[in-house]
Amino acid sequence: MRKKLQVYISSTYADLVEERHAAVEAVLEAGHIPAGVGLFFKETQMGIIKRSIDESDVYILILGGFYGLTLRDDESKSYTHWEYDYAGEVGKPRFAFVVTDEALEQKPYDFELGGYYQKLQEFKRSVLEEIPTFYVEDVQHIQLVIHDQLQEYAGRDDLCGWFSGKDVPEVQKLWEENASLLRENAKLNAELEENKKTSE
């Protein structure tokens, strides 16, 4: 039976379009399920983000040159940073990519002029200290690492993943047994009610 992992991909938006796309592609090519609200929304509700991380098996962070959009109720922390912290709090296996300075220089942004540059550097340092982190210069490197890492994670028994119904043949049998037990239970309840009435 083949287990598909749900993989939450977190990154800033504008500076990492290609890297994020490459990560999604690598997850799909490895036969798993990419997730991440940034795949659909630039800004979204915390409840949706939490649910998406909770339902995921693995969390991937990609750090580029921007710290990211800050939270509405706490401007000292970006959504990306908050997602990273939350995934850690709920015990998700995490790994990260840091795009090298050389690769960032090829992008049409002056990252040091952007706001929160120092916060980004502090965030990078904490990520490097806490979880497996890979420096990457191109999208091919991201894809290779994701293939290797997900192969390792797929073998872990503590990660539930997703299974296709057709890969779980006993499910149909369980449905039938459950329906039979429900019918039997209803019949016994009816008999019990009848016995109560006759004994009164």
Which residues make up each language-model segment?
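Conserved N-terminal substructure of TIR/SEFIR domains
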Residues: 1-62, 90, 172-200
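C-terminal interaction surface of TIR/SEFIR-family domains
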Residues: 105-195
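Hydrophobic anchor at the start of a short beta-strand
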Residues: 34, 94, 133
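Solvent-exposed loop/turn segments at secondary-structure junctions
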Residues: 14, 42, 66-68, 101-104, ...
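Conserved TIR/SEFIR loop-to-helix hotspot centered on a Trp-containing motif
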Residues: 40-45, 66-90
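A short helix->loop->beta-strand "cap" motif at the edges of active sites that frequently abuts
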Residues: 89-102
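Extracytoplasmic/secreted cell-surface and envelope-processing proteins
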Residues: 18, 69-71, 105-107
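Generic beta-sheet signal
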Residues: 62, 97-99, 136
